[in-house]
Amino acid sequence: LRNSSAASDVYKRQNNERAAIIGGGDGGVARECISKNFNFIDWYELDPEVVDVCNKHLGDIGKKATEKNSVKCVWGDAFESIKSVSDDTYDHIFVDLNDDQFCIDLAAKNMDSLVRILKPKGVITAQVGSQDKKPQQVENWLNVFNQNFGNAKLSRVYIPSFDCSWNFSSSIN
């Protein structure tokens, strides 16, 4: 999400009070939420060991976001965990899962829960892969967003470490 002008536009349009991160084991999204002054960040991550390994070997990405007071880590299955979250809790939800069809299907299956916990006028953003390398995958993500929100916007940013452009889809609830 860093360096994405579309993500920057999203931040300008909304309240940055509460964010939820689904996945994102490397901590990059959490770091960016901290830098954008979200007051409360709930980070739903399956495995604390993944975060520990990323902190150890990729420390610059997450900048030890788990140690920040504004970040609350919720370990375990994110989609099970969010079942207990109150309606209309989050201003922004970031979906940072693996970029494969399994994860697209997983997000689609749980989209009702994500919509439920997203505030009215809240924004959901997902990293959807590279349109250059896997255009069908990006299209599948856009279909999920459009079926649930009808207003998916695609942004693109060059990621040097990926050596390609990467896409993000955002929708407003």
What are these regions (language model features)?
Residues S5-L142, C164:
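The AdoMet/dcAdoMet-binding core of the Class I SAM-like
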Residues S130-N173:
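Class I S-adenosyl-L-methionine
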